[in-house]
Regions:
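Generic structural signal for short, flexible, solvent-exposed coil/loop and linker residues
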Residues: 11, 158-160, 192
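Active-site or metal-binding loop neighborhoods of secreted/extracellular toxin and effector enzymes
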Residues: 166-210
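Membrane-inserting hydrophobic helices used for pore formation or membrane fusion
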Residues: 1-148
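Acidic, glycine-rich flexible loop segments
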Residues: 129-177
């Protein structure tokens, strides 16, 4: 199984900046790379270099991608680089929104919004939780999300809503990720102790329903 280049242009740009390229590496080779980072276990971050644990996490993200967990991989990569993540329905690539739209929980939410008749909404009653049974990849990227929206009217009727789905990805705080990596990363016991290089990031997904 060959690794694929990052599909997100922000991540590809950061990979180029820090001279990171896992394309063409098999999962076995990626695991050996993580082992090498553990054995060296030294900080070498400076200028255009990342430290060993950051590189190990990026390799783990690539393993997740190769196993079909694109959304989870992206969140880890953005977390390593400490960049907030956003998607808009107008973007050329919307992996989180694409998977979110396939879930029953989000389709139920959309029906709730459309039936509400509200011009604007936000707050706790408009939150929902992604379960692993909804979509395993999405479960590792989003958890309990909050939403807000604005309805746009033609005449006296609301024709569509623009909504924002928000979450915070905080790997060090959440413990839902173990079963994703325990079966794919050989040195997970070491890697899961290195969450200090992962940064909490904000996730904002913007879309329209109607």
């Amino acid at each position: 199984i060959s690794s694929r280049k990052a599909s997100n242009p922000v991540i590809q740009s950061m990979n180029d900046k820090y001279h990171v390229d896992f394309s063409g590496m098999s999962i076995d080779e990626l695991n050996k790379f993580i082992d090498k980072m553990k054995d060296e276990d030294q900080t070498r971050a400076s200028g255009n270099l990342l430290n060993n644990t950051q590189l190990a996490w990026l390799a783990a993200a690539q393993i997740a991608r190769d196993k079909g967990y694109e959304c989870a991989a992206l969140m880890v990569e953005f977390s390593v680089y400490n960049i907030d993540y956003s998607e808009s329905v107008t973007d050329s690539s919307t992996p989180l929104l694409d998977k979110l739209n396939t879930t029953t929980v989000f389709n139920n939410y959309k029906n709730k919004v459309l039936n509400s008749g509200l011009k604007d909404f936000s707050g706790g009653s408009w939150s929902f939780t992604i379960q692993k049974s909804d979509n395993a990849d999405l479960f590792y990227a989003l958890h309990r999300v909050s939403t807000s929206g604005t309805g746009f009217m033609i005449g006296n009727s609301i024709m569509y809503y623009l909504i924002t789905v928000h979450d915070t990805f905080d790997f060090a705080y959440d413990n839902n990720y173990d079963d994703l990596f325990t079966t794919t990363v050989n040195n997970w016991a070491w890697l899961c102790q290195q969450t200090h290089v992962l940064n909490p990031i904000e996730i904002n997904l913007s879309t329209a329903i109607g």
